[in-house]
UniProtKB/Swiss-Prot annotation:
Belongs to the transketolase family. DXPS subfamily. Mg(2+) binds at D149, N178. GO terms for cellular component: cytosol. This is 1-deoxy-D-xylulose-5-phosphate synthase. Its EC number is 2.2.1.7. The lineage of its organism: Bacteria, Pseudomonadati, Pseudomonadota, Gammaproteobacteria, Pasteurellales. GO terms for biological process: 1-deoxy-D-xylulose 5-phosphate biosynthetic process; isopentenyl diphosphate biosynthetic process, methylerythritol 4-phosphate pathway; terpenoid biosynthetic process; thiamine biosynthetic process.
Length: 615
């Protein structure tokens, strides 16, 4: 490694980084970018975001005394360079793997990871709490939050900015704006103004002038407006953050290491809430990622010398099946509306967005708004379909109850990534949606076992006049033939195999695992289809005819489908041995989906062993 990366091989902590002379920092950035590309291409992971913040990461650790100073990364997709510089360089080949490095900043992994993250827009709220604590303790530590131009659109981020500005706490928020490339002329002007507005002389005059002119409101107001006009001339968005109580600087070139260091050194000594706006290019330094930052956001293993990502498998994903269904329905009904909170690609809605732009809404990272926006459309007689990941629906729970379910509005929730998701770990597992939706009145919840059933359930939801959730897993579908769509009978399961002694009640896409066990031991196998309402008559019949009932689901056992079956059996007074298989009471770490199923006993082998242990 020393031969290929002579500078990076010397950096085992930010302390080593701070020993480098400034003229070595850009060569270090070049090595860091090359190493990041090499390691991610060999292991899979998030690439384009990290490539875009190499200079920023180096500058932050060079200027700030991390981990004494607190550095917080929002979401964490961009934190790979941070991990490399903070003692985890030689472990990068394990990232997102079982027992390897966590895919996001993780408190248990390193003292440099101040906040465990994975979902967006949390950094400023947590950073403000940390900054307030530092002030109360007179610790002298600084707090820096790095947030992207996508994450800052969320309401939570602006709630935190509004609060921070109102209490005037010392902290720095850095907006990593990678939406468009930097204009050379505007970038140069902004770099100059950044040095001016963050310089010690300007800071002294600014604060001193406020005191001197405090008794002369008209002059004080003139000076304030003049300063804002100069800043607004370059970046009108700056006046918004100034209005919220922040001292806004920027935008500046986020790939100019010298300018970043100069600006950050000045800002480190400024008091009150500071806002630095930097412009970066996602995928910087790797042409394929620069040209296709969305495609190279999260990548599988690939040949970085060719820049070609491997072709997807022939079997479509559940997300693709959903997108195709949405297009098919939009051809029939102009009142069907597709809604996504900034997950167009992940939710399979690219084709729909192109073919039906008037029926497609990307509301940005705003899950709460997405749900209530759908409620409004439903009130007006439209058929809204909210396509959302299970773990992100958690952020809109009040809206699901207050704005949709209480009013019994026909909003369809297409819940992607339900169950075990794999390499993204604890923050992204879809483990809780059955539990938190099942207790909500007026909700209908369906759990398809394959893509054909998924289509039938989505169509069934379309025909209903009440809120409906269809939950389906991450990854490739089963490859079954798609049948013409028809509405299912609500709350009715389907006996797939009649056996004896043991009945397996399957909820969702683990059906094939259950089928292997049922065929080996001649057990009864049931595709329950509906988690709410349950097929109560079928459950009672199965309880009468079998010695053991087994429920199988990709959801937390507490409050899930198995709990629903148990509650019903208790309600009718049938005391029957019941084995509930699902996700236990802990957060599931990163691994492949297959590894997690095996660890949790949700593959065929684990299901079989648990059933046999009950007999």
């Amino acid at each position: 490694m020393q031969k290929t990366y002579p500078l990076l091989s010397q950096i085992n902590s930010p302390d080593d980084l701070r020993l480098l002379p400034k003229d070595k920092l850009q060569p270090l950035c070049d090595e860091l970018r090359a190493y990041l590309l090499e390691s991610v291409s060999q292991t899979s992971g998030h690439l384009a975001s990290g490539l875009g913040v190499v200079e920023l990461t180096v500058a932050l650790h060079y200027v700030y005394q991390t981990p004494f100073d607190q550095l917080i990364w929002d979401v964490g997709h961009q934190a790979y360079p941070h991990k490399i510089l903070t003692g985890r360089r030689d472990q990068m080949h394990t990232i997102r793997q079982k027992d390897g490095l966590h895919p996001f900043p993780w408190r248990e992994e390193s003292p440099f990871d101040v906040l465990s993250v994975g979902h967006s827009s949390t950094s400023i709220s947590a950073g403000l709490g940390i900054a307030v604590a530092a002030e109360k303790e007179n610790a002298g530590r600084k707090t820096v939050c790095v947030i992207g131009d996508g994450a800052i659109t969320a309401g939570m981020a602006f709630e935190a900015i509004n609060h921070a500005g109102s209490i005037h706490t010392d902290m720095l928020v850095i907006l990593n704006d990678n939406e468009m490339s930097i204009s050379e002329n505007v970038g140069a002007l902004n770099n100059h103004l950044a040095r001016l507005f963050t310089g010690s002389l300007y800071g002294t005059l600014r604060e001193g002038g406020k005191k001197l002119l405090s008794g002369i409101p008209s002059i004080k107001e003139f000076v304030r407006k003049t300063e804002e006009h100069v800043k607004g001339f370059v970046s009108p968005v700056g006046t918004m953050f100034e209005t919220l109580g922040f001292n806004y600087i920027g935008p500046i070139d986020g790939h100019d290491i010298e300018e970043l260091i100069s600006t950050l050194k000045n800002m480190r000594n400024m008091s009150g809430p500071q806002f630095l706006h930097i412009k970066t290019k996602k995928g910087k330094g790797y042409t394929p990622a620069e040209q296709d930052p969305i495609g190279f956001h999260g990548v599988p293993k690939f040949d970085h010398t060719s820049g070609k990502l491997p072709q997807t498998k022939s079997v479509p994903t559940y997300s693709n099946i959903f997108g195709d269904w949405l297009c098919e329905m939009a051809e029939r009904d102009p009142k069907i509306i597709g809604i996504t909170p900034a997950m167009r690609e992940g939710s399979g809605m690219v084709e729909f967005s192109k073919r039906f732009p008037q029926q497609y809404f990307d509301v940005a990272i705003a899950e709460q708004h997405a749900v209530t926006f759908g409620a409004g459309l439903a009130i007006a007689g439209y058929k809204p379909v909210v396509a959302i990941y299970s773990s992100f629906l958690q952020r809109a729970y009040d809206q699901l109850i207050h704005d949709v379910a209480i009013q019994n509005l026909p909003v369809i929730f297409a819940i992607d990534r339900a169950g075990i998701v794999g390499a993204d770990g604890q923050t992204h597992q879809g483990a809780f949606d059955l539990s938190f939706m099942r207790c909500v009145p007026n909700m209908t919840i369906m759990c398809p076992s394959d893509e054909n059933e998924m289509r039938q359930m989505l169509y069934t939801a379309y025909t209903m006049n009440s809120p409906v959730a269809v939950r389906y897993p991450r990854g490739n579908a089963q490859g079954v033939e798609l049948q013409p769509m028809q509405a299912l009978e609500i709350g009715k399961g389907k006996v797939l195999k009649q056996g004896e002694k043991v009945a397996i009640l399957n909820f969702g896409a683990l059906l094939n695992e259950a089928k292997q066990v049922a065929e080996t031991h001649n057990y009864t196998l049931v595709d329950m289809r509906f988690a709410k309402p349950l097929d109560e008559a079928l459950i009672a019949e199965l309880a009468d005819r079998h010695e053991l009932l087994v429920t199988l689901e990709e959801n937390a056992l507490q409050g899930g489908a198995g709990s629903a079956v148990n509650e019903y059996l208790q309600h009718i007074g049938k005391i029957k041995p019941l084995l509930m298989l699902g996700i236990p009471d802990f957060f599931i770490p990163q691994a492949t989906q297959a590894e997690s199923y095996a660890d949790l006993g949700l593959d065929a082998k684990g299901i079989e062993q648990k059933i046999l242990s009950m007999k």
